[in-house]
A protein has these predicted regions:
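Glycine- (often His-adjacent) and acidic-residue-rich active-site loop
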Residues: 59-104, 154-156
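Conserved CoA-thioester-binding segment of acyl-CoA-metabolizing enzymes
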Residues: 1-58, 82
């Protein structure tokens, strides 16, 4: 079994891998280059092991994740500035690849051929919620501590890892637009009403509820990858 610094992967007799995100030395999990490297390897591990039926990803901390590490974004922009002085076209390509890395990783997960379920035990923001949306199943703990959001708009940026594509394919258009343009926090009850999560579970039964989704035959295919998929709110028309 591979070893990871930021994740613990355990596969029980049920054939379901439990991926626990628990970054050492941090009070909250965040996406860094290293975290993305490791998650990429875990997706390969789950997909390539015939003994693994699917995976549940959760957090080993009181919160799920705050999203992307802002210092990582600063490094991207710093590297862009350095490369731009040497070769502007190369710098643009590099920035595009770096910015799109998380999007590609989440798409890889949702098309890996194995079902993934996100077990959201606490605050789940930005890129972390986009990761959850890429999972085939989503379960949130029934707790006031659980808040889900795409809050990037509050700091002048827009969700860049698939949230703007997946939310409108799950929720009706009006609710999706309100969420994406306001950065509002969603409680488990509100998120379920918007069809952004599938189940709400007692905190102590969160992981078991997530595993049950896989045992009960959760398909490793997103609704929008099914033939004949239609937006939940119907076609969007303009005047």
């Amino acid at each position: 079994m591979a070893e990871y610094k930021n994740f613990k992967v355990e596969t029980d007799a049920d054939g379901i891998a439990l991926v626990t995100w628990d970054m050492p030395g941090r009070s909250m999990n965040v996406f860094t280059e290293e975290v993305m490297d490791e998650l990429d390897r875990i997706v390969d591990q789950v997909a390539g092991d015939a003994a693994i039926k699917g995976a549940v990803i959760t957090s080993g901390k009181d919160t799920f994740s705050g999203g992307a590490d802002l210092t990582m974004l600063q490094r991207m922009l710093g590297l862009f500035a350095e490369e731009k002085a040497k070769d502007e076209d190369k710098a643009i390509r590099l920035l595009f690849d770096n910015v799109g890395r998380m999007t590609g990783l989440f798409r890889k997960l949702e098309t890996s051929g194995k079902p993934w379920v996100s077990a959201i035990n606490g605050t789940c923001m930005g890129g972390a919620f986009e990761l959850s949306l890429a999972c085939h199943g989503r379960v949130a703990a029934d707790s006031d501590k659980v808040k889900m959001a795409l809050p990037e708009v509050k700091v002048g940026i827009f969700p860049g890892a698939g949230g703007t594509q997946r939310v409108p394919r799950l929720a009706d258009t009006q609710s999706a637009l309100q969420m994406l343009t306001s950065g509002q926090n969603l409680s488990p009850k509100k998120a379920k009403a918007m069809n952004l999560i599938h189940e709400i579970a007692e905190p102590k039964k969160l992981v078991e509820t997530a595993k049950a989704m896989i045992r009960n035959g959760l398909k490793p295919v997103q609704p929008w990858d099914e033939k004949g998929f239609k937006l939940p709110g119907g076609p969007v028309y303009s005047a």
